[in-house]
Amino acid sequence: MALIKKFRIKSFKVDETIVELKNISFFYNKRQILNNLNLKIKKQEILGMLGPNGVGKSTIFNLITGLKDPNYGEIIINGINCTNLPINERFTKFKLGLVPQYGGLIHDLTLLDNLKLVSEIHIKEREL
């Protein structure tokens, strides 16, 4: 079982839910990874998940971003059910981002600088 820990970035309370997983179940090769998971992520929260391999940590992120689809349940982002939205719509419509566990980062830059670099490249492409 994964341990899910939430932190708030600021000290004041914000109740606006931006991501909600409702009754999510997910199977991988007939093995149930998630069973009726319910999770709310509110604005200005940082979510950390700890646990051994195979308990669903990466699967949760893959479900939120649309890299995987749940077998059962709903994924709500900013109040919109996006369970069946294609991945490209989910990333562009909701401005989702994902930092890979391995690779994909320039090691000499901080995480913030890596994110800034990607956003600058994306903005420049749109301006062309």
Residue ranges and their predicted role:
Residues 50-52:
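The feature captures the beta-strand-to-loop junction immediately N-terminal to the Walker
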Residues 19-21, 34:
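Conserved structural motif at the start of ABC-family nucleotide-binding domains
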Residues 65:
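Helix-to-loop junction immediately C-terminal to a conserved catalytic motif
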Residues 102, 108-121:
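Q-loop/switch helix immediately C-terminal to the Walker
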Residues 58-59:
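Conserved Walker
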Residues 73-82, 91-93, 127-128:
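Conserved ABC transporter NBD signature motif
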Residues 81-97, 102, 121:
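ABC ATPase NBD coupling module
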